[in-house]
């Protein structure tokens, strides 16, 4: 069976962003609140998103080089049952590498996923049914 690196099959729009929780000291939080009350930012979330985007911009070239070196698909990548059936008919297995969101559609059975997905590396989020995630657990890096 031939192993192939995945290329974009289909694009999706995320229904919701991933949420994160951070712990901040009271002084840091107070300084953020001060900037919000002084109208530098509309709210705490605006400040945090801006800070994250600024840091990502600072390290943008490093990220770009790492994406190319690791052969990652950048953005949103969805795998439907039809996509994976085509992979099975071709006798291939996917080595999924995504920076962003990898989504295995609800119509993908555990058997089809196991037969067609060799490994999954996701820097970001993986959306799949609980059963598919459990079946692929040893292949998720």
Please name every model-derived segment.
Residues 1-16, 84-105, 111-141:
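A detector of short terminal or domain-flanking linear segments
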Residues 3, 7-13, 30-34, 42-66:
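Short, basic amphipathic alpha-helical segments that act as recognition/interaction helices
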Residues 14, 19-21, 72-77, 98-100:
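N-terminal start-of-chain detector that recognizes signal peptides
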Residues 17-34:
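Short amphipathic alpha-helix starts
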Residues 57-90:
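Short, positively charged interaction helices/loops
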């Amino acid at each position: 069976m031939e192993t192939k690196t995945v290329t974009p099959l289909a694009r999706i729009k995320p229904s919701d962003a991933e949420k994160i929780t951070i712990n901040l000291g009271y002084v840091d939080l107070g300084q953020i609140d001060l900037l919000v009350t002084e109208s530098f930012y509309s709210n705490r979330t605006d400040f945090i998103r801006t800070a994250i985007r600024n840091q990502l911009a600072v390290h943008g070239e490093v990220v770009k080089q790492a994406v190319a070196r690791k052969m990652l698909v950048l953005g949103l990548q969805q795998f439907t049952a039809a996509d994976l059936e085509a992979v099975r008919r071709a006798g291939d297995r996917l080595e999924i590498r995504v920076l962003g969101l990898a989504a295995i559609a609800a119509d993908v059975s555990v058997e089809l996923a196991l037969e067609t997905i060799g490994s999954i590396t996701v820097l970001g989020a993986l959306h799949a049914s609980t059963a598919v995630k459990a079946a692929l657990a040893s292949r998720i890096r």
